[in-house]
Amino acid sequence: MIKLKNISKVFNVSGKNLTALDNVSLEVPQGQICGVIGASGAGKSTLIRCINLLERPTSGSVIVDNTDLTQLSDNELIHARRHIGMIFQHFNLLSSRTVFDNVALPLELEKTDKTQIKQKVDALLNLVGLYDKKDVYPANLSGGQKQRVAIARALANSPKVLLCDEATSALDPATTQSILKLLKEINRTLGITILLITHEMDVVKRICDQVAVINKGQLIEQGSVGDIFSNPKTLLAQEFIHSTFHINLPEEYMENLSATPKHAKSYPIIKFEFTGRSVDAPLLSQASKQFGVDLSILSSQIDYAGEVKFGFVIAEVEGEEEAITQTKIYLMENNVRVEVLGYVG
């Protein structure tokens, strides 16, 4: 449904060329949700704006629904954009129009019959859960409600593609989850292909089928969410995944944690990261029995990304130095990532 081929975008800033996108290729199949994740300034917003040619690429092809948008005339492009909805971090609602009238605006611009407009807008407001707010003005809505109005408006022309530009970054966590749930429902019920950009891996984890990691204008890693979470190949992808872990060690451990052992009775605090089959296997208990070490679990978290289970355990590991070393080797051989956080004792 969306195919980017060798997209580059160069801006001229004060007489100097600034490369925002460098030979980016990406494909999103029909009906899937793809997340593009990267830090601020990585090129995410430029990338998504190239898809509907709000930013025209310096080079490369943008193919949406088998049509290369870069080859269209201005009038043809206007027509093609009707099939591409877009929502933004800031909702861009018209304060002088009610919820109903904001959603109706794209249809009015198309000179749609008033009866059809009412039927369409009522259906969309039911879909986003705001039918009872149809006569309310944006000033009297919460942030989450405003984003729901923006989503309904983006769907007014029955697009085949929905672009989401940091659509949840201005929302609180609970509202973010409700908007993500709505986007997933829209994807399932309407079959709309969704491409979203974000700097939050939690967003990707919750609703995406595939993910692409962008850094300094280049896509450095892409694949299914399950594959990326279970086997991230780049340091940046690993860092984004680690950001979804909420590590809480007891305060007494944090205060006494040292980078190196202070004496013979200092024991390591180790983080064990599990993905896929290693999550369900009793590897820690097997290692404890086999090598004679004691593991005191201090913190743990298990979650899902796509259909892949992943998580971590942080434990104080007590035993002979050689036994602890063998424990780490055994777990790494069974696809567990091992990181010594420090020493206590």
Swiss-Prot record:
Location in or out of the cell: Cell inner membrane
UniProt-listed InterPro entries: AAA+_ATPase (IPR003593), ABC_MetN_proteobac (IPR012692), ABC_transporter-like_ATP-bd (IPR003439), ABC_transporter-like_CS (IPR017871), ACT-like_dom_sf (IPR045865), MetN_ABC (IPR041701), MetN_ABC_transporter-like (IPR050086), NIL_domain (IPR018449)
Matches recorded under Gene3D superfamilies: 3.30.70.260, P-loop containing nucleotide triphosphate hydrolases (3.40.50.300)
Gene Ontology MF term list: ABC-type D-methionine transporter activity; ATP binding; ATP hydrolysis activity
SMART domains (UniProt xref): AAA, NIL
Enzyme class, spelled out: translocase
Record-linked Pfam families: ABC_tran (PF00005), NIL (PF09383)
UniProt keywords, alphabetically: Amino-acid transport, ATP-binding, Cell inner membrane, Cell membrane, Membrane, Nucleotide-binding, Translocase, Transport
Residue intervals of the ABC transporter domain: 2-241
Catalytic activity: L-methionine(out) + ATP + H2O = L-methionine(in) + ADP + phosphate + H(+); D-methionine(out) + ATP + H2O = D-methionine(in) + ADP + phosphate + H(+)
Binding site for ATP: 38-45
Family listed: Belongs to the ABC transporter superfamily. Methionine importer (TC 3.A.1.24) family.
Function: Part of the ABC transporter complex MetNIQ involved in methionine import. Responsible for energy coupling to the transport system.
Protein name, per record: Methionine import ATP-binding protein MetN
Organism for this UniProt entry: Histophilus somni (strain 129Pt) (Haemophilus somnus)
Source organism phylogeny: Bacteria, Pseudomonadati, Pseudomonadota, Gammaproteobacteria, Pasteurellales
